[in-house]
Design a protein with these regions (language model features):
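Noncatalytic alpha-helical scaffold of FAD-dependent oxidoreductases
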Residues: 1-129
């Protein structure tokens, strides 16, 4: 994709935006099992960035699992989105029940197995609440 950063956010992560001022989307409308990709493009050439964005839009239109795509060009909205992402662990940590821990491990999964892996992890977390 030519991205400088790609971050995967599950439904619970996306909902943490409700704890931030003026989120660029409605976190209360995030349904269960919805996920998001935060993709950042950086390049000195605006033409190259435009090309990368066009490719992403074309991909999202072909991919049946993509519900929507929002391009954020406003500097304040971009900063807010990254603030939400960077504040994810502290926010989730502050919301957890007393006596519980937050796990911050990265995992590597083939793209075709990602949805199944996430469902499996959610099942494990719910089972051991």
């Amino acid at each position: 994709m030519g991205a400088s950063a790609i971050e995967f956010l599950d439904d619970e992560s996306l909902r943490t935006a409700q704890h931030f001022e003026n989120p660029p989307y409605d976190p209360k409308s995030v349904e269960n099992d919805v996920t998001g990709l935060l993709i950042e493009y950086q390049n000195d050439s605006q033409n190259e960035i435009d090309r990368l964005i066009k490719e992403s839009k074309e991909f999202s239109q072909k991919e049946s699992s993509v519900i929507s795509m929002k391009l954020v060009t406003d500097q304040q909205d971009r900063e807010t989105i990254w603030k939400i992402r960077k504040g994810l662990y502290p926010t989730l940590g502050s919301l957890r029940k007393t006596g519980t821990s937050i796990i911050t491990e990265d995992i590597a999964v083939d793209a075709e197995n990602l949805a199944q892996a996430i469902r499996g992890l959610k099942y494990i977390f719910q089972k051991h609440e």
